[in-house]
Amino acid sequence: MSRLERLTSLNVVAGSDLRRTSIIGTIGPKTNNPETLVALRKAGLNIVRMNFSHGSYEYHKSVIDNARKSEELYPGRPLAIALDTKGPEIRTGTTTNDVDYPIPPNHEMIFTTDDKYAKACDDKIMYVDYKNITKVISAGRIIYVDDGVLSFQVLEVVDDKTLKVKALNAGKICSHKGVNLPGTDVDLPALSEKDKEDLRFGVKNGVHMVFASFIRTANDVLTIREVLGEQGKDVKIIVKIENQQGVNNFDEILKVTDGVMVARGDLGIEIPAPEVLAVQKKLIAKSNLAGKPVICATQMLESMTYNPRPTRAEVSDVGNAILDGADCVMLSGETAKGNYPINAVTTMAETAVIAEQAIAYLPNYDDMRNCTPKPTSTTETVAASAVAAVFEQKAKAIIVLSTSGTTPRLVSKYRPNCPIILVTRCPRAARFSHLYRGVFPFVFEKEPVSDWTDDVEARINFGIEKAKEFGILKKGDTYVSIQGFKAGAGHSNTLQVSTV
């Protein structure tokens, strides 16, 4: 079916299909309890996000504990936990007595890196915590403060600690606000000492993935992997692309990362807002082609922080991110501090179902096969062939037996028009597979039996039963299965078409 035929035959009834796009929700004070987490999971939450820009270790440990408690209360599908790093941000200092100072247009003042002003800022002089700012910026350049609420033009680089600037609009100078230098290559380290401690905390407490903020180069990813160490070798690194450097170096970053987040908030400040649309589509397409999961984030249902219903533009934004190819969509303040967190997750889930119905799966599959460099690995060849078999046989599901989670990721790359049932003995693989579009993970807890054929049959039957529970398969339905010829990772080479 062509894309046009697909669109003209859309079934626009919400809830008429099973959602395949995963939902990430940031947990804050209003949602950090087991009962609310259960409600969020029932509404569609798959991955819990902890924002390490805020909160103590005690607080974040409570989020982890409550997430795990919610699984005891409501087993369902496994829940994944993500740690979002603060990252190498640039921020203003503290104003005197923590007062907000009004700034009129054309107001001239000083930006300084002199530490004596770090806690003594006012409307005449503002401390900035990036020591090299005078080396990387020049007269005429623009500096944004507080997510672009205030704009300043650099009038003069006075000395190695001082900039003279002019306000381009009215606003307020406040404490600890973010500073952006659009179009400027900054040389901040990939990780602050706080970030390193946060990563070690995450490894110790069993997080499944890291959302790495402000990634600029491939070396940044390698630095994070080094800090995670041997104990954290299975933690997935998802890079957040939120500046021009990250966009420019994306191809090299993509080679070494486990996944990508298009973080449109800071990205929309660093580059012209209209360009974010094209960058989003480009980064998602490149991630899809590489078989790496991609998340679309920031302000997706922002109005639902305070309103029970979204704007129509927000619904379209969520839907179009899914049509672009996003594996996951993310909520931030909507679930962290919003008045309607469960409504927000429900709205996102319902929107995802409708958007997925608008996808022309077969043309997408053909595009992916044609654009993927050859030869592919044995595992990817089997994965692509399984998806082809789904289209040929009109199969209702793909059952994947996997140890490492690689095979379901590659099946997801080719976007079958049916769910992917992952059966694994590895709880971690089950949890991080929520990153992959269409994967429904289940942990098979029985010990392996000595006869390999019997063990494979037991796991496939388990997958069939789980698919029946979710209404994916029924008696007489065709399904495709993928398994290996022996135990362990890297041996998926067998494809089978069967009937329930």
Swiss-Prot record:
Regulation: The activity is regulated by glucose levels. Activated by fructose-1,6-bisphosphate.
Phosphoserine: residues carrying this PTM: S9, S16, S70, S213, S316, S450
Coiled coil segments of this chain: none
Residue list for modification Cysteine persulfide: C418
A Pfam family per the record: PK_C
InterPro entries tied to this protein: Pyr_Knase, Pyrv/PenolPyrv_kinase-like_dom, Pyrv_kinase-like_dom_sf, Pyrv_Knase-like_insert_dom_sf, Pyrv_Knase_AS, Pyrv_Knase_brl, Pyrv_Knase_C, Pyrv_Knase_C_sf
Residue numbers carrying N-acetylserine: S2
UniProt EC number: 2.7.1.40
Record site feature (Transition state stabilizer), residues: K240
Residues that bear Phosphothreonine: T31, T184, T478
SUPFAM superfamilies: Phosphoenolpyruvate/pyruvate domain (SSF51621), PK beta-barrel domain-like (SSF50800), PK C-terminal domain-like (SSF52935)
Modification after translation (UniProt): Conjugated to URM1, a ubiquitin-like protein, in response to oxidative stresses. The attachment of URM1 to lysine residues exclusively depends on the presence of a peroxidatic cysteine in the target protein, with low specificity for the particular residue, motif, or structural context at which urmylation can occur. The URM1-conjugation reaction is mechanistically and directly coupled to the process of cysteine persulfidation, transfering the sulfur atom of the URM1 thiocarboxyl group to redox-active cysteine residues in the target protein if it is exposed to oxidative conditions.
Keyword Methyltransferase assigned: no
Gene Ontology BP annotations: glycolytic process
Reaction(s) the record says it catalyses: pyruvate + ATP = phosphoenolpyruvate + ADP + H(+)
Note: Present with 291000 molecules/cell in log phase SD medium.
Oligomeric form and interacting partners: Homotetramer.
Name this protein carries in UniProt: Pyruvate kinase 1
Originating gene: CDC19
